[in-house]
Amino acid sequence: SGAKVADGRIVATASGIAVAPHLVEIDPTTGVVTPLATPAAQPPQAGALTEVTATAEDGTALRAWLRLPDGTGPHPLVVFAHGGPWGSWNAWTYRWNPNPFVAAGYAVLMPDPAISTGYGQHMIDRGQHELGGAPFMDIMALTDAAVARVDIDAKRTAFSGGSYGGYMSNWVAGHTGDRFRCIVTHASLWDTESMGHTTDNSGWDGPMHVQNATYNPKDAVADIQVPMLVIHGDKDYRVPIAQGHALWYDLNTYSATPRDDHGRTQHRFLYFPDEGHWVLGRGNAEVWYRTFIDFLDEHVQGVSRQAPSTLG
């Protein structure tokens, strides 16, 4: 991800889906990569890592990574949709890290659909102008391939994502009925028509404007049937908090999600007054992971958890 050249030696930082950033030396003649000594060991990895493949409707080869808990399963599954939208799961992150979910007993599917990087310009172009089109269909194809495995429980699944992945979560919520038991959406685009006029990235308005009539998640709110956990930071200027507020209001006013036995909404809102587009504070990150996993436990596994003590 970064490199320095001195005395014929190339020193760089390298990382991957299961490897945190670390220093390496690259031989410019042979290309051999040698890890260098570091003061801290690599973070331990939970479970096992494998790949899932599928074929898109247009014949494009698709890939996802699948992190599996220990044991034979079948395991409950949570799907992670990446942000960007130009991105890939083939990178280390302390946000949206699968380890806590795997440790909690969940298999984690991380698909790279149309618009993902690392697969050539054609892959990006497939999804560039239809954010709820080919990327959605690719993710569903990879999810189908994952739940066909004997170690995955097809009846206990959830969907999630942040930023563009949150857009995808909202889109999935309105277009898959009760396929997933619950959906978690973080810093998400809900109303693309208003989003382009309020974000700090004004470049969004043009590309989104021509897609609003076809790919605006808000238009399918009446078809949302499952509980959603909405997460947003008040200091988010990339996807302003108004998107989260609008989503929360629309879910509780117009969605088809049934209320609980006491007539209360099953949707939840996790609000961070001091966070932006990313949740970076250590205590806040712990609350993020705990609340996320507790929501999965409640709706995927039928187990209620006590809210984290640090949750205000």
In which residue ranges do the predicted regions lie?
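Conserved beta-propeller blade repeats
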Residues: 1-13, 42-51, 97-99, 220
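Helix-coil-helix junctions within alpha-helical repeat/solenoid scaffolds
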Residues: 5-8, 25, 29
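Short loop/turn positions at the edges of beta-strands in beta-sheet-rich folds
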Residues: 17, 56-58, 177
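Structural motif
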Residues: 18-25
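Hydrophobic/aromatic beta-strand patches that form the interior of the parallel beta-sheet core
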Residues: 24, 52, 79, 109, ...
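Cap/lid segment of the alpha/beta-hydrolase catalytic domain
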Residues: 31, 37-163, 168, 190, ...
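Active-site-proximal cap/loop segments of hydrolase catalytic domains
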Residues: 113-312
